[in-house]
A protein has these predicted regions:
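Catalytic-core regions of core metabolic enzymes
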Residues: 1-672, 677-698
Length: 698
């Protein structure tokens, strides 16, 4: 729709690309033309029978009419090339909303708008205005940037890297990354999914879709907009609201997506995942004719999560028998600079046969005694024989070109820099671990939702968005352990509460003769006073005989500090021995893209100083919660470092899960902090809490 033969136009470029290799029928729609590039022109899409896909290349002023016309004609798949939508201001955003409404009305699958187009090499389909078609392959690639698509296809063609599908997502008004991940995950001819993303439309849907696919099909993504400036640029490019970088990092990890920061890594990882098997173990063998590059490669292995393979005694003996006396028969295996291809081949054969070797790097520098082409043939044969991943670094320029092409055609990736080879092998290891993950559904605990709802609605009735210790009942309702305590609004009630908690003191609050008992913690309760310690609104280790006077003192301090503050009372709480455990923090904040993010880390006064925290997208499963506890830097403290008794880690894990359920159940909770969550050998207790709510969500 919008086909034309005008030189330099998008309509002409797409029509020509479709006519080049497409196996199906191409039909042109343009009421002002009789013929375009040898094709008869139809006045309207309704005049054309059995249309599978409509490619819309008309001006913004009539694009909505064209899409509606396609829907009325029974077309179900539309690619909108036209720009001038959400990326171009309020008028464009309004146009994009109307496009979505039309798509909903006619049940249309729409790519774009503001898209470069789509490719499917199995069909010879190139419905883009890019300068060339992609080569066939097993990688499906989506990009939020159309310009990036043209550059990538050109780059990939130069390196014999083929694609199954290429999609320019555009503004993602209807179809987005989640849809294509799900579709390509079901495609037996897609071995790897690659993506360039600036934002995610529906974060929770993407996590769900990617998690279901990633155990069988690797997904590798460059997510730009990591910095504040980058996020701002991405927003202006796509018109999207960006989620936090922390949220993206957590979401992609949970979904089993490999995130990379460079285009080089995106396609390095894609190439090796598409062409090589996964390693059964982490040990890497390095076989080289160059000592210096061998050391560099060894350093790269040390910087990764791989390891330098330890050869068996039998392997070392085989190397000693096969190699010159000057050779290094330990890893990295240096077969000396004069090595012919036969020596390389025998050394690689011995290395791949070692049971401790999971993968190998073949590292060569050009010499007069070595034929790169013969070496490539040997590497291809040995990789096929052992079915273990091999990465090749044939250093040099024109001397390595033909050999690298031979290796690439066999699915063996080639690199000039050995560090890239190691990073790519490490990506295989990482995806192997992802593919072995056992995903479990988050547990649903038996909780008192109505009690929790009443606490939140009570706050809304008071027209307050912030809750402090009065939210302890919310935690109690969800089974999160808290110290014994209650909120009171009278001196006598404070004394009674203290007596109940620890014993001692007189009913009237006067000093008793026998004193006795442990002290209690007392805190002013006011939604208008967040930092209670700053105004002297917290008293610790208060003896029972002083509870009454302390109650009066706390209320007076609060009223003097903020006369118009709402004072709900004073919390009287049992003392918790912070030295008996580790102060941690558990909390959440609500991300615009991914919803509630659950946080765990080292708490108390160290939260903002050390920033030792980790996050997950809720709902959090038991394995996710266990990972959270184990991946903070302070994990050894929890597990008994320096002679300490280990904390009850299962209790901490369950607390994280219950918190996740709470914030998932109540979208009105915008932020929540339990700090400290004291973890001890006997369990975990939420000592203090504060949260913010959105009353409109109740």
């Amino acid at each position: 729709m919008g086909a034309t033969d005008r030189e330099g136009s998008v309509g002409r470029a797409i029509t020509a690309n479709l006519l080049a290799d497409f196996d199906g029928e191409v039909l042109a729609v343009n009421p002002t033309k009789d013929e375009v590039l040898g094709l008869r022109c139809y006045d309207a899409v309704g005049d054309v029978p059995d249309v599978d896909v409509a490619v819309v290349v008309v001006p913004p002023s009539i694009v909505l009419d064209a899409i509606r016309e396609a829907g009325e004609s029974g077309v179900r798949n539309v690619v909108v090339i036209t720009a001038g939508f959400g990326e171009s201001g309020s008028e464009g955003a309004s146009r994009e909303r109307e496009l979505r409404e039309i798509a909903d009305e006619y049940d249309l699958n729409v790519v774009g708008p503001n898209s470069l187009g789509i490719m499917n090499t199995a069909l010879g389909l190139n419905a883009t205005f890019g300068p060339e078609n992609a080569q066939p392959g097993s990688i499906s690639f989506m990009s939020q940037s159309g310009a990036f698509v043209t550059a990538v296809v050109d780059w990939a063609n130069d390196r014999n890297l083929g694609f199954r599908n290429v999609v320019s997502l555009g503004n993602k008004a209807v179809l987005d990354e989640s849809d294509f991940v799900a579709e390509w995950g079901d495609d037996p001819d897609t071995d790897v999914i690659l993506g360039y993303l600036e934002d995610v439309v529906d974060g929770r849907a993407f996590v769900q879709s990617a998690r279901e696919v990633s155990s069988d099909t690797p997904i590798v993504v460059v997510k730009s907009g990591r910095t504040e400036a980058g996020a701002s640029a991405a927003a202006s490019h796509t018109g999207a609201i960006a989620g936090s970088e922390e949220a993206y990092e957590a979401a992609l990890d949970q979904a089993g997506v490999l995130r990379v920061e460079t285009v080089q890594d995106l396609f390095d990882f894609g190439s090796i995942l598409a062409g090589q098997p996964l390693p059964e173990r982490d040990g890497v063998a390095i076989v080289t004719n160059a000592g210096g590059p061998g050391v560099m490669t060894t350093d790269a292995v040390g910087d990764s999560d791989l390891s330098l393979a330890s050869f068996t005694d039998e392997t070392v003996e085989r190397f000693q028998d096969a190699l010159p006396g000057e050779a290094n028969v330990y890893n990295p295996v240096d077969i000396i600079g004069d090595a012919p291809v036969e020596r390389f081949e025998e050394a690689l054969d011995i290395a791949l046969a070692d049971p401790n070797v999971g993968a190998a790097v073949v590292l060569a520098c050009p010499t007069a005694t070595l034929s790169y082409e013969a070496l490539a043939d040997a590497v291809v044969d040995l990789q096929a024989e052992y079915d273990r991943p091999v990465a090749a670094t044939l250093m040099g320029g024109s001397s390595a070109r033909d050999a690298n092409e031979r290796l690439s055609q066999a699915g063996i990736p080639t690199y000039f820099d050995p560090a890239r080879a190691v990073r790519s092998l490490d990506a295989l290891r990482e995806y192997r671990d992802i593919s072995r993950r056992e995903y479990t559904e988050p547990e649903t605990f038996d909780v008192d939702r109505e009690a929790a709802r009443e606490i939140l609605e009570s706050a809304a009735r008071r027209d307050t968005n912030r809750l402090g210790v009065e939210a302890m009942g919310l935690l109690d309702a969800y089974g999160i352990p808290t110290p014994d305590g209650e909120i009171v609004d009278a001196r006598s009630d404070a004394v009674a509460a203290a007596e109940r908690i620890v014993g001692g003191g007189d009913e009237d609050g006067s000093d008793g003769d026998d004193g006795g008992g442990e002290g209690v913690v007392m805190k002013i309760v006011s939604p208008d006073i967040l930092h209670k310690s700053d105004i002297g609104g917290v008293a610790v280790d208060v003896p029972p005989e002083e509870v009454g006077d302390t109650y009066e003192d706390l209320v007076t301090r609060a009223r003097n500090y903020q006369p118009d503050a709402t004072i709900l009372g004073v919390q009287v709480q049992e003392m918790v021995d912070l030295d008996a455990g580790v102060e941690t923090i558990a909390g959440m904040n609500r991300d615009p893209q991914f919803g509630p993010l659950v946080l765990f880390g080292l708490g108390g006064i160290f939260v903002e100083v050390l920033e030792d925290t980790t996050v997950r997208v809720a709902p959090v499963s038991e394995p996710d919660a266990r990972e959270m506890v184990g991946e903070i830097d302070a994990a050894p403290l929890l597990r008994g470092a320096r002679g300490r008794d280990p904390v009850d880690e299962a209790s901490v894990v369950e607390t994280i899960q219950r918190l996740s359920q709470l914030v998932t159940d109540f979208p009105a909770i915008v932020e929540l902090d339990i700090n400290p969550l004291v973890a001890t050998p006997d369990g975990a207790q939420a000592v203090d809490v504060r949260l913010t709510i959105d009353q409109e969500e109740l």
